[in-house]
Amino acid sequence: MSTYAIIKTGGKQVKVEVGQAIYVEKLNVEAGQDVTFDEVVLVGGEKTVVGTPLVAGATVVGTVEKQGKQKKVVTFKYKPKKGSHRKQGHRQPYTKVVINAINA
C-alpha cells in the first residue's frame, strides 16, 4: 500500500501521493523551487495517522512545476427591455506542484 497524505492549502484539502502532480491556489514561489506543506491533516499507508487537527511533525515536500491561469470564466448580467448589460471575465491563477516526499 502506497503512502498518501491529506494536506491543507489554499483553503482546501487535497489528497496527495509521491510523484503526483496537483493544482493548487497560487503560491508565491518561483517555478523550479521546492515548497513545503506543513498543514498535514492525515498520513495513510501501512499505519494511518489522523491529526487532531494536524499531524505533529509531518510535512509534504513538492517542487513547483509552473504557474499559470485557468480558462476564462465569463459572467454576463442584463436587464430585460432596458438596454443595460454587463460582461465580465475572470481567470483564476494556479500553481502546479509535483509531490516529492511525504515525511511523517
Swiss-Prot record:
InterPro entries: bL21-like, bL21-like_sf, Ribosomal_bL21, Ribosomal_bL21_CS
UniProt signal peptide: none
GO MF term set: rRNA binding; structural constituent of ribosome
Assigned keywords, A-Z: Ribonucleoprotein, Ribosomal protein, RNA-binding, rRNA-binding
Gene Ontology terms: cellular component: cytoplasm; ribonucleoprotein complex; ribosome
GO biological process: translation
Database matches in NCBIfam families: L21
Quaternary state and interactors: Part of the 50S ribosomal subunit. Contacts protein L20.
Main function: This protein binds to 23S rRNA in the presence of protein L20.
UniProt record similarity statement: Belongs to the bacterial ribosomal protein bL21 family.
Name listed for the protein in its UniProt record: Large ribosomal subunit protein bL21
Taxonomy of the source species: Bacteria, Bacillati, Bacillota, Bacilli, Lactobacillales
Gene this protein is translated from: rplU
